Amino acid sequence: MAENLVNTFVTQVIENSDYEELDRIYLTNKVFTLVGEGVADIETDSSELIDLKDQLLQAGVKAGSVGELKEEQDIIGAQLMDLITPRPSVVNRNFWDTYKSNPEQAIADFYAQSKRNDYVKVKAIAQNIAYKAPTKYGDLEITINLSKPEKDPKAIAAAKNAVASDYPKCQLCMENEGYLGRINHPARSNHRVVRFQMEDKEWGFQYSPYAYFNEHSIFFYGKHEPMHISPLTFGRLLTIVEVFPGYFAGSNADLPIVGGSILTHEHYQGGRHTFPMEVAGIKEKVSFDGYSDVEAGIVNWPMSVLRLRSEDKGRLIALATKILNCWRGYSDEKAGVLAESDGQPHHTITPIARRKDGKFELDLVLRDNQTSEEYPDGIYHPHKDVQHIKKENIGLIEVMGLAILPPRLKTELKDVEDYLLGQGNQVAPIHQEWADELKAQNPNITAEEVTEVVRQSVADIFARVLEDAGVYKTNSEGLAQFKAFVDFVNLAD
């Protein structure tokens, strides 16, 4: 039975917050302030809070009281959802009060709140195409990211004309909490951050709005300072997996080409997800002099990964620091490995921490950001022949075996499927050679098979992408060169 939209939304706000029935008129006027009184007589069949919020926005657009640009609607939508979101002080008090007796419950409650108030965009994330496919490195995870809407040309034009602002300094800064937003900076009225201490300094814990995996979290420094991989990084990651049980924690590398998209603010990512790299076995055990108590091995993975395990955090940090320092200064001309050129460093590490079976675990992924005439985008970066699938930097998430592929592939891959079935002769030029190869390999392909064939090929290409990003190749020569670096570490003081 249809009910009044505003009244139903207000009822849901009261049920999901500390507002009471006496606050109904006040809340109704809050809603009118945001979306206009022109929505007063609209009816709804829904009782789901986020659906009701979306209906209010659309009614406001129709009435002319809400702008047509998605960015304008997001600003108002976040304010509507802020009505059910406790103040930051309450969020933090509730989190740490619960944490004292049940850390897992404290985390679960904060995650539930972040979904309930639409900060984590559950409906948008559900639009992503996601699947697993077998490769010689195990099952890789493929996602075509459709959750983040592409910019409307009108929004791009409006952003160009917007008054310049450097507040907040970036999208990770603490000052985003409760920030209204603008045409070129996301709405954050319903954003909340849990504060915690590391090294007697304030850090923030939040969820990623457009999550790439389960409980995708961000842990960021309270001050706007650039990313830097150092001994402190290893200690912080191991502290995070201790403080937030069940979560892994990792850092993007701190150099261009091999780093993430935000290098200007010190932050780490984590969450409750088992990535393909985590379940990959050890290709060859190695040992480090003076660290017989630390289990170590080269991981069977397309990228160059050393895995360290110990019950003692301090020992892991000490060995990881030694490996980092050695890698930063290590060159091997025959292997194509160069520590620096013209004073510019090329070497860093992408580190990932976990706590498993009573032990701490560190995966150290060796990175090299050299470029050359042949590979101007990066020698250890997706090469030209696979850039039709993935040309962006290989950051932390891809390193671990989860491909984040661009939205364009949704339609482009459908065109490739049609081409293989003989139902279309048009594919994007960047895919033509690949489509012809698939057609030659599968001359009698059926409609029942075609999606799986294309998806499997995409996964195989992603495995190749990771091989390109790997400093040491996965053949016997590459393994010998990798072990030569291990020997170098053992010779170092």
UniProtKB/Swiss-Prot annotation:
Substitution effect: K70N: In strain: SMQ-301
Principal localisation: cytoplasm
Gene Ontology molecular-function annotations: UDP-glucose:hexose-1-phosphate uridylyltransferase activity
GO biological process, one term: galactose metabolic process
Reaction(s) the record says it catalyses: alpha-D-galactose 1-phosphate + UDP-alpha-D-glucose = alpha-D-glucose 1-phosphate + UDP-alpha-D-galactose
Catalytic activity, EC: 2.7.7.12
Keywords: Carbohydrate metabolism, Cytoplasm, Galactose metabolism, Nucleotidyltransferase, Transferase
InterPro entries referenced in this protein's UniProt entry, alphabetically: GalP_uridyl_Trfase_II, GalP_uridyl_Trfase_II_CS, GalP_Utransf_C, GalP_Utransf_N
Database matches in PROSITE patterns: GAL_P_UDP_TRANSF_II
Entry GO terms, CC: cytoplasm
Transmembrane segments: none
Protein localization: Cytoplasm
Top-level taxonomic group: Bacteria
Pathway(s) served: Carbohydrate metabolism; galactose metabolism
Protein family (similarity comment): Belongs to the galactose-1-phosphate uridylyltransferase type 2 family.
PANTHER family, A to Z: DUF4922 DOMAIN-CONTAINING PROTEIN, GALACTOSE-1-PHOSPHATE URIDYLYLTRANSFERASE
Protein name from the UniProt record: Galactose-1-phosphate uridylyltransferase
Organism in which the protein naturally occurs: Streptococcus thermophilus
